[in-house]
Regions:
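Conserved catalytic-core motifs of GNAT/GCN5-like acyltransferases
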Residues: 92-102, 233-246
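A conserved beta-strand-loop-helix scaffold within acyl/acetyltransferase catalytic domains
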Residues: 137-186
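Conserved beta-strand-loop-alpha-helix junction that forms the acyl-donor binding cleft
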Residues: 73-80, 214-224, 241-245
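Conserved active-site alpha-helix within GNAT-family acetyltransferase domains
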Residues: 79-92, 196, 219-237
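N-terminal charged segments
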Residues: 1-67, 78, 82, 150
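Conserved acetyl-CoA-binding loop-helix of GNAT-fold acetyltransferases
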Residues: 53-61, 182-185, 191-204, 229
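Conserved acyl-CoA
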Residues: 58-68, 173, 197-212, 233
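A short beta-loop-alpha structural element at the N-terminal edge
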Residues: 1-6, 51, 111-125
């Protein structure tokens, strides 16, 4: 299957996170921001093209500074914008790798789709425990999950063990693309094939629909090796840049 172009993958990602945070555009530049989730991941900007990166970075900086947030900008590694920003007042905080599935995932525990009647609290709890280690934000996350049950193009998957949700994964579909998000395993269920099982189910769904399965992962999360071992390959990378605070 032919891999989707970069713009299609980026629009899929932004379409997904616009369900969690507010999304604003200026030409090919964008900014995400949230009052509920104050971490940089939900308060960041970027550009769909290299040409628009410089003006987009200036606009994103103003927009996030007005919200009392540290300006965070994601720049394609093959754009000179990353070099220019780091040469001025930005520092690299992380790297985001964008991957596509290029073969069978293989192995893993079984996963099932979540029905609209299922508990949004339970899915949200597993997501938060997987990524944050606590459930402090279960209220706002459960509210989003509840709306996702009925959102077009979204499928929520879960893997259960010992009577509870052991891992979660979300699929968001756009033209030709099935984006995978929120791949998480609850700590006490790790190293038991939970994530592999979820990815296997997602791969089967994407293949059946004729879509490319793609995902993003941050270098700091330490999951890149897992995905590479499960048949994914790197399409491109983005520098996660933050403005130095004076």
């Amino acid at each position: 299957m032919r891999e989707p172009d970069r713009r299609s993958v980026e629009l899929n990602e932004l379409g997904w996170w616009s369900k969690w945070a507010k999304l604003r555009w200026r030409d090919d530049g964008y900014v995400l921001y949230s009052d509920k989730f104050r971490e940089p991941f939900f308060n960041r900007g970027g550009s769909l093209t290299c040409r628009a990166a410089a003006p987009a970075a200036a606009w994103v900086e103003r927009a996030l500074s007005q919200r009392k947030m540290t300006p965070t900008f994601l720049a394609f590694e093959d754009c000179r914008a990353a070099e220019k920003l780091t040469a001025s007042s930005y520092v690299r905080e992380d790297t985001m790798a964008v991957l596509s599935s290029r073969g069978p995932v293989g192995g893993g525990a079984g996963a099932q789709a979540v029905s609209p009647s299922a508990s949004s609290d339970e899915w949200a709890s597993a997501y938060l425990r997987s990524f944050y280690g606590d459930e402090a934000l279960v209220g706002p996350v459960a509210s989003i999950v509840s709306s996702l049950f009925h959102s077009r193009g979204v499928t929520l998957l879960e893997s259960r063990a010992r009577g509870e949700v052991a891992g979660v994964l979300a699929i968001f579909r756009t033209r030709g693309v099935a984006g995978v998000y929120c791949v998480g395993t609850v700590p006490e269920h790790r190293r038991r094939g939970v994530a592999s099982g979820l990815l296997t189910r997602a791969k089967k769904l994407a293949d059946a629909e004729g879509r490319s399965l793609v995902l993003q992962t941050l270098e700091s999360d330490g999951a890149l090796g897992l995905y590479l071992a499960r048949g994914f390959g790197v399409m491109y990378t983005k520098a996660v840049l933050q403005k130095r605070l004076k």
